[in-house]
Amino acid sequence: MKIAILGLSGSGKSTLAKQLGSFYHAPVLHLDAVHFLPGWVERVPGEEEQLVTSFLDTHSSWVMDGNYTKTCYARRLEEEDQIIVLAFNRFLCLWRVIRRWWANRGAVRDSSAPGCMEKIDAEFVWWVLYQGRTPARMAGYRQIARQYPEKFILIQNPRQLARFLSSGSYSQ
């Protein structure tokens, strides 16, 4: 099984990726961990592309979380069996980001790149509330739904996510 988890910051992409990776006994690739070097420095795009390509070439199943439309995006969407988009309310996402920061302050989450300490600042708050959910990004998700209707799953709130997980829909 090959699964993409796309969506908004703070919606729970990494948590869901770990759950599904465990269920399928599939490797999980957190694209944040590929995109960033220690200290939240962005990796050179060609190197990022090479790392993701190598991952895709060497695994027959996977769970991948993160958007990163410039990193093997078309190939990822084409190869994946399910494309799950988490599009929760902006204020819920912000609350979850704050809660995540509080729980992990001074530490590096396992879904982050080594040396990227959990942080929250005005720029990231702006990203969660506005920049990360632009009309263009939302239109991109709608385009994926049109292009891959048979494997597209939109989850808009925690209740829908709980229903999805309890229904076993992910195991089809």
Each language-model region and where it sits:
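NTP-dependent small-molecule kinase module
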Residues: 23, 126-172
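The conserved Walker
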Residues: 9
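Hydrophobic anchor at the beta1->P-loop junction of P-loop NTPases
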Residues: 5
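Glycine-rich phosphate-binding loop used to anchor ATP phosphates in small-molecule kinases
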Residues: 50-95
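A glycine- and Lys/Arg-enriched "phosphate-lid" helix/loop adjacent to the NTP-binding pocket
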Residues: 88-135
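Walker A (P-loop) ATP-phosphate-binding motif of ABC ATPase nucleotide-binding domains
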Residues: 2
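Conserved lysine of the Walker
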Residues: 13
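Conserved substrate/cofactor phosphate-moiety recognition/catalytic segment
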Residues: 18-61
